[in-house]
């Protein structure tokens, strides 16, 4: 088996562990998982976040435009002996369900919204709503834009650049020059600049949510992202008042913002 497959399996297992330890309890206060709800994940990758929901007996559907990830998701679920459906597509091109019964009780969008460029975020939310049952909930998780690695620069080939915090806050011209100087190829630079164009501070997210006529029923800001427990062996740490209430500045120390939205 290719090293890439082994690496993706590790990543799948890490996501499943975080989902099992944190996502399940976070959404279970609003969704009765014992009732086997229908769960949709947009931008599912290899499906690690969905695995614990499938273990609970939920029907799960994952959508992602990366065929390799969808193929891995199908393989990993089959290995686990669990049922999961996966679609390789741009979510915006997936037709909405034709009946209420085919819609979903819970929609997961984790580490996705910060990759959607600005003009398309409102359209994305409106399309998402068409997949939700009248009393459904949506979970969103994303890194606040100004946090140390909010630009995802950790994906850089250069070990030096990948460890530099806050460089995504440079001007686009300065950022491009820095990336070029340290050998990043044009594809990687384009990806990082797209993330810069798609920036998602929490205040802007809530503005889009309000415009979409969705209600925030729960929000949690993390200084130490729960996924860092399995990734870096760090203990997750929630922000506390008054740090959660400081506009703009909170984006600099919020490594992950979690929201539960309701129709």
PLM regions with names:
Residues 1-102, 106, 110, 122, ...:
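Conserved N-terminal segment of class I S-adenosyl-L-methionine
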Residues 11, 15, 65, 116, ...:
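Conserved aromatic-histidine-acidic binding/catalytic patches
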Residues 95, 116-117, 149:
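Activation segment
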Residues 98, 126-129:
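Short amphipathic alpha-helices and their capping/turn segments at secondary-structure boundaries
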Residues 111-115:
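Short catalytic micro-motifs in class I SAM-dependent methyltransferases
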Residues 117, 132-133:
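Helix-to-beta-strand junctions that scaffold the AdoMet/dcAdoMet cofactor pocket
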Residues 120-127, 137-262:
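S-adenosyl-L-methionine-dependent methyltransferase catalytic module, highlighting the catalytic core
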């Amino acid at each position: 088996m290719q090293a890439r497959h082994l690496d993706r399996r590790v990543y799948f297992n890490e996501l499943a562990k975080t989902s099992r330890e944190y996502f399940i309890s976070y959404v279970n206060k609003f969704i009765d998982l014992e009732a086997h709800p229908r769960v949709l994940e947009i931008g599912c990758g290899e499906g690690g976040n969905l695995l614990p929901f499938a273990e609970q007996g939920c029907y799960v559907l994952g959508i992602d435009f990366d065929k390799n990830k969808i193929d891995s998701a199908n393989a990993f679920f089959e290995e686990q002996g669990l049922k999961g459906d996966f679609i390789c597509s741009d979510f915006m091109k997936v037709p909405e369900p034709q009946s209420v019964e085919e819609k979903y009780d819970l929609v997961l969008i984790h580490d996705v919204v910060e990759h959607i460029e600005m003009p398309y975020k409102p359209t994305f939310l409106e399309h998402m709503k068409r997949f939700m049952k009248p009393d459904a909930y949506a979970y969103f998780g994303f890194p606040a834009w100004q946090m140390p690695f909010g630009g995802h620069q950790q994906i850089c080939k250069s070990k030096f650049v990948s460890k530099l915090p806050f460089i995504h806050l440079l001007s686009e011209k300065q950022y491009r020059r820095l990336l070029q100087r340290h050998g990043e190829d044009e594809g990687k630079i384009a990806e990082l600049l797209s993330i810069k164009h798609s920036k998602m501070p929490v205040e802007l997210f809530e503005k889009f949510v309000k415009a979409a006529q969705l209600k925030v029923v729960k929000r949690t800001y993390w200084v130490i992202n729960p996924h860092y427990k399995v990734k870096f062996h760090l203990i997750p740490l929630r922000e506390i008042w008054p740090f959660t209430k400081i506009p703009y500045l909170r984006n600099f120390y919020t490594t992950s913002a979690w929201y539960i939205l309701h129709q």
